[in-house]
């Protein structure tokens, strides 16, 4: 309403529920910009589509997410393609505890796989994502098996054993080092993890006869100007080479940009700085960042 400012002051409103889940991102961003000046705690009700599909409960109130500030609507996924690789299948995610791997796991369990195998090097990251998925599965009464396995994708025979033991049909290979400055300073480890681990995991998938192997790559693999980008491009070339050896396993690559809110990106850093009361720091005043 036009007199929202006066309404908030008169009735001492300290919380606003944003109940317009079906509105466009652009309109949502406009509303949030107006509410920002009121200094009132704002929460959102879940999208009706998420409620109907079981992704959310109708009584779940959500904090405003950075994605709500985007000025466009998200591009919906191709459900036919997802079903072909996930529904009723045994799916493994390597690097399952990372920011990208864990989000893949969250989305995969909602698409009715037979089982999800979480393959992760970090014990605490594996524990966290397993606990979260089991809670999600129980609360939404999903019929999905979850197995949490510690392991290094570089160890080909460990990967091979896991693929065979769980009858894995689809692999999402998200295990990698992705931070440009760190990989720049740790070149050998970057090559070891991003190139050789991909090679060994893909070879294991080839030998077992996995149906689909998807490498989570990066836009930095395009005409790479950093060690990290070069290692991911090498990993892509490895898969392209392996594809010439078989028609049984389909090797795929997807290139991500900077994912909004992923670990190590500036958005979580900004949020933490704001929670601590500032200041909010930037690398350079003229830097322009792009997110997906």
Model-derived features with residue positions:
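Flexible, Lys/Arg-rich cytosolic regulatory linkers and terminal tails that connect or flank
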Residues: 2, 28-90, 96-97, 206
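NAD(P)-dependent short-chain dehydrogenase/reductase
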Residues: 134, 203-206, 227, 233-292
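Proline-aspartate-enriched helix->loop->beta-strand connector
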Residues: 8, 12-15, 113-114, 163-172, ...
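Conserved Rossmann-fold cofactor-binding substructure of NAD(P)-dependent oxidoreductases
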Residues: 147-170
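N-terminal Rossmann NAD(P)H-binding glycine-rich loop of SDR-like oxidoreductase domains
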Residues: 90-111
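A solvent-exposed beta-alpha-beta segment
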Residues: 1-53, 121-130, 147, 151
